[in-house]
Amino acid sequence: MAESGSSGLEEKLAGLSAGCGEEPQQLSKNAKKREEKRKKQEEERRLKEEEKKKKAAATAAASGEPPKESAADDEEMDPTQYYENRLKALDSLKATGVNPYPHKFLANITVADYIEKYKSMNVGDKLVDVTECLAGRIMTKRAQSSKLLFYDLYGGGEKVQVFADARTSELEDNEFIKFHSTLKRGDIVGVCGYPGKSKRGELSIFPKKIVVLSPCLHMMPRQKSEGSAVPTPWAPGMGRNIEKYVLRDQETRYRQRYLDLMVNHEVRHIFKTRSKVVSFIRKFLDGLDFLEVETPMMNMIAGGAAARPFVTHHNELNMRLYMRIAPELYLKELVVGGLDRVYEIGKQFRNEGIDLTHNPEFTTCEFYMAYADYNDLIELTETMLSGMVKELTGGYKIKYHANGVEKPPIEIDFTPPFRKIDMIEELEAMAKLNIPKDLSSDEANKYLIDACAKYDVKCPPPQTTTRLLDKLVGHFLEETCVNPTFIINHPEIMSPLAKWHRSRPGLTERFELFVNKHEVCNAYTELNDPVVQRQRFEEQLKDRQSGDDEAMALDETFCTALEYGLPPTGGWGLGIDRLTMLLTDSQNIKEVLLFPAMKPQD
């Protein structure tokens, strides 16, 4: 039936094409032979398809099982033609006075609640006197005959079968056939009917009425599996295999995230996990009497971190502004003002490279805790992260494909306490170095340049001491940090906002937490001496003048705030995107960002 209709449509289109524009040219003998051969092959293919459908329907009828999903004829056509056909069908429907986009549909129960309410029914049972109304998106369509069809209706990530039988429908047979021929995969529909279980034991709704709420005009990616079973749910801490996704093309998945969420069941769980991560952090900090605040995202000075900012312009004030690279300075001003425990979860913007672990726009949590130091924050970090992993996964160990999905996953253990390594001591031991104590000297800079050359550690200009140290630490220390590891006691030259170490001159009370060789967390005892802070800013200006545009700028407003007195304070920052990557076995940061930064399409 569908094949014949498709063939007839093609003939009509061909006739319309022939009837307009230029006179059709006469075909040569060879061209005629090729055309006749093509038509013969199409006819043979059509007959074979019809025979296959008849056999499949007969087999399904004999076994009492619904047929497996097969590609609808119109889904075999070119996607552009499919879209145009759907637009025409929509116009025809509107011409009859039917609104394919109704304002309201009263769904009295969700798909999840429907499953919970009726899952205990016996095989073959039907509650014909009960009426339930569901709404969702059709993801698969299977026809046993023109009067018996099966749909998989998805709502809220859950699936229920729609058992559409002409005998139980309010429509006459011819209307039933016509209506269901127009229903396509991807359409959002409302279904009113009674609950029951099929002979195979699948919970279903037997519709008396189906209402199209929003038609899908584009061809949907086809389910990889012919069956209609919901895949085993993915859970945080488990490994993933994107090769099993229905939609696998990365460009399409990231640019059309709505489509990714529609057809890749697991992706919804990834972003639900991200939401749970944020909720856990918020609940944890609220439980410690922290106050959540909001600070400006546009600043006159790009301060609080060493990074290249995005620049914008305020027309009314005729002034340059910078998108924030960190909320740190504002949050510490609030602690000066007497808000002893504050935190902010929000976006930061850095005009830097895009790679597997970096996106120009990313999410962090920063908190500041008066009367605490970095030792307190180490303990707090261990408690928070180990507790989060335990709550989300049921244990402290997670699986992560650090070397690609084609290789076995590694195990990352969040069991507290975490490993700690002293930055300079460990670097000197591993690289057999004897780094000069005065890191601000030319001697130290020359020594580190030679060390990088010796071990073939690349450090593009400007080769400041800070950048050289950072590259060496990345090469030697970070590579050892698979399980959660604190790298502690950074040099002052690397930490302009951190307080000097109370017993080790030249160092600061700072730590960075690395997991799977990537930084996840950064914290320190805050520098609260305004004189020393101003000196540190001035040292950063020298690096900026040397060409390091990531060096911090001098913020007079912040220095003035420090002059009013900042209590002993511990400051802490966490990258939520990278943490979510670990908990969801994601090797690309774009996997955990709903709308990641993408290059313009050609």
Swiss-Prot record:
The protein's UniProt keywords, in alphabetical order, are: Aminoacyl-tRNA synthetase, ATP-binding, Cytoplasm, Ligase, Nucleotide-binding, Protein biosynthesis
Q: Where is the composition biased (Basic and acidic residues)?
A: 38-53
The protein's name in its UniProt record:
Lysine--tRNA ligase
The record's top EC class is ligase
Family the UniProt entry places it in: Belongs to the class-II aminoacyl-tRNA synthetase family.
UniProt GO cellular component terms: cytoplasm
What this protein catalyses is:
tRNA(Lys) + L-lysine + ATP = L-lysyl-tRNA(Lys) + AMP + diphosphate
Q: Which organism is it from?
A: Oryza sativa subsp. japonica (Rice)
PROSITE patterns in the record: AA_TRNA_LIGASE_II
* Source lineage: Eukaryota, Viridiplantae, Streptophyta, Embryophyta, Tracheophyta
Q: Where in the cell is it found?
A: Cytoplasm
Query: EC number(s) for this protein?
Result: 6.1.1.6
- InterPro entries per record: Aa-tRNA-synt_II (IPR004364), aa-tRNA-synth_II (IPR006195), aa-tRNA-synth_II/BPL/LPL (IPR045864), Lys-tRNA-ligase_II (IPR002313), Lys-tRNA-ligase_II_bac/euk (IPR034762), Lys-tRNA-ligase_II_N (IPR044136), Lys-tRNA-synth_II_C (IPR018149), NA-bd_OB-fold (IPR012340)
A GO molecular function term, named singly, is: tRNA binding
